[in-house]
């Protein structure tokens, strides 16, 4: 694997000789081993094994039916009682959830400071928890007073997170669905997300924003970055996982953010100055025009409170939201 320190040493000697040192982005893009360097028969066998793993953890007809029933149940409960609409977002409608994956819902209603929407939803679910005739078993209802306020519970032993007036989650869902269709290859983007999520959740234990770990959308953005740069050399989920691990295990997270088009020096913030990757724009998967259209279609106008804090705030892990560049998708990660 390439080592960032080797490139830094090269840069220092190059400057001494009068040459321009490569940017981090260019160094990273050039230093990765090419998957085809592995014997083709070995690579095909490994991809078949990876496909077996994806088949074991991907959504099934039974899991789809179960989750659809739970979503419909919550929609009916809240809709009949409060007249509020409830929509699923995240991994369930994207069909990239793991067997242990939760259901993300958002309920729409009054956003006024004196609104009782959140407490009303909590009361409805607490009533169902005591209702022996309820359609599904409801347990462990709790209110989470976090940056995004939630009512969390177990319904039929599936974790359900209900947020409120979260249009951003629906916009992100639409954007990722559009990207998957753009990539094609029998939903290679979604299959790769499933494999990489499985590795992050079951093997490395780094997935889970509520536990100070990386969020699902942040992970999906990192996967999308790998597709954007290396899509021409990737035809299976294992090749994507290989590129993902190779690239980000050597990334200089202490000094750089990651954006869809390359690293951004933390020292340059609040200005978003993307380093040159030495990859021609024509060779990238997503053109600037594609992203601009997506932002126009799926981004929301900033609220007054968001306008007052509209600068990207560096944390321990820094990932720039493709749809809103002042939003740090790595902000959930705490230092271990």
Q: What function would you assign to each model-found segment?
A:
Residues 174-216:
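Basic, alpha-helical interaction scaffolds
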Residues 214-228:
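P-loop NTPase catalytic cores that bind/hydrolyze ATP
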Residues 1-100, 113-119, 136, 141-143, ...:
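N-terminal regions immediately upstream of nucleotidyltransferase
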Residues 122-170, 191, 201:
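Conserved catalytic core of two-metal-ion nucleotidyltransferases
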Residues 45-49, 69-73, 116-120, 150, ...:
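Acidic, Ser/Thr-rich intrinsically disordered and amphipathic helical segments
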Residues 93-94, 110-113, 148, 156-158, ...:
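Conserved beta-strand elements of beta-rich interaction domains across eukaryotes
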Residues 29-30, 39, 225-336:
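Pol beta-like nucleotidyltransferase catalytic core
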Residues 86-96, 139-150, 210-218, 236-245, ...:
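Short amphipathic alpha-helical segments embedded in low-complexity Lys/Glu-rich regions
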């Amino acid at each position: 694997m390439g080592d960032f320190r080797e490139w830094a040493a090269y840069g220092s000697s190059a400057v001494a000789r009068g040459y321009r040192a490569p940017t981090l982005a260019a160094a990273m893009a050039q230093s990765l081993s090419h998957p085809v360097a592995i014997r083709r028969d070995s690579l095909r066998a490994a991809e078949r094994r990876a496909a077996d793993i994806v088949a074991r953890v991907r959504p099934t007809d039974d899991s789809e039916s179960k989750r659809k029933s739970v979503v419909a149940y919550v929609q009916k409960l809240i809709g009949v009682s409060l007249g509020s609409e409830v929509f699923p977002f995240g991994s369930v409608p994207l069909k990239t959830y793991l067997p242990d994956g939760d259901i993300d819902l958002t309920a729409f209603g009054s956003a006024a400071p004196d609104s009782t929407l959140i407490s009303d939803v909590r009361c409805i679910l607490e009533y169902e928890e005591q209702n022996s005739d309820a359609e599904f078993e409801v347990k462990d209802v709790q209110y989470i007073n976090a940056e995004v306020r939630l009512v969390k519970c177990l319904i039929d032993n599936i974790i359900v997170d209900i947020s409120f007036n979260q249009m951003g989650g629906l916009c992100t869902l639409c954007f990722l669905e559009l990207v998957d269709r753009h990539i094609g290859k029998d939903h290679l983007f979604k299959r790769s997300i499933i494999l990489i999520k499985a590795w992050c959740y079951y093997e490395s234990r780094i997935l889970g924003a509520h536990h100070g770990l990386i969020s699902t959308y942040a992970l999906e953005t990192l996967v999308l970055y790998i597709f954007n740069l290396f899509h021409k050399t990737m035809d299976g989920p294992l090749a994507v996982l290989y590129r993902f691990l190779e690239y980000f295990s050597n990334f200089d997270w202490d000094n750089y953010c990651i954006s869809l088009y390359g690293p951004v020096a933390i020292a340059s913030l609040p200005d978003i100055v993307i380093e040159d990757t030495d990859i021609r724009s024509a060779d990238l998967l997503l053109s600037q025009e594609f992203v601009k259209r997506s932002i126009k279609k799926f981004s929301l106008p900033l609220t007054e409170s968001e306008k007052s804090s509209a600068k990207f705030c560096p944390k321990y892990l820094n990932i720039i939201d493709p749809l809103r560049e002042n939003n740090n998708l790595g902000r959930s990660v705490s230092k271990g």
